[in-house]
């Protein structure tokens, strides 16, 4: 169960994210699958305090909606800058919070269909094809 669903809130989730990111280690598989993007994410995970500070900042700036979404930004999916790169806030929340290195095919999906949402319990990952199927289901 997500800490948000259990009512414990952002602080518990941030603590969980800290635990997850501290367990990150590069291994032989990382070396075999290394790309420029994966190396960038690995370096972000290794800069733990910077990653967690940015994560905490955006989580605390988000506003809760009636649907339980944590909306960050005014219009559309909000981009943030970190370590010289611009990424979507929801990507930072999902990949850093779970200490998962995305591959080129991985995307963060919104179960709530709200691209402004950064609520970790509303986010999951999959492929671009999964994302398209989500959109078709939402429209039907």
Question: What do these predicted regions represent?
Answer:
Residues 2-107, 114-140:
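Conserved recognition-core residues within compact binding domains
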């Amino acid at each position: 169960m997500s800490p948000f669903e259990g009512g414990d809130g952002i602080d518990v989730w941030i603590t969980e994210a800290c635990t997850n990111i501290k367990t990150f280690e590069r291994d032989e598989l990382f070396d075999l699958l290394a790309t420029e993007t994966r190396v960038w994410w690995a370096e972000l995970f290794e800069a733990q305090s910077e990653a967690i500070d940015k994560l905490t900042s955006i989580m605390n700036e988000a506003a809760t909606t009636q649907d339980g979404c944590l909306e960050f930004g005014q219009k559309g999916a909000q981009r943030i800058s970190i370590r010289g790169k611009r990424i979507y806030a929801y990507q930072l929340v999902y990949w850093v919070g779970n200490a998962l290195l995305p591959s080129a095919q991985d995307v963060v999906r919104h179960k709530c269909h709200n691209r402004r949402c950064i609520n970790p319990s509303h986010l999951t990952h999959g492929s671009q094809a999964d994302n398209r199927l989500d959109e078709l289901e939402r429209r039907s």
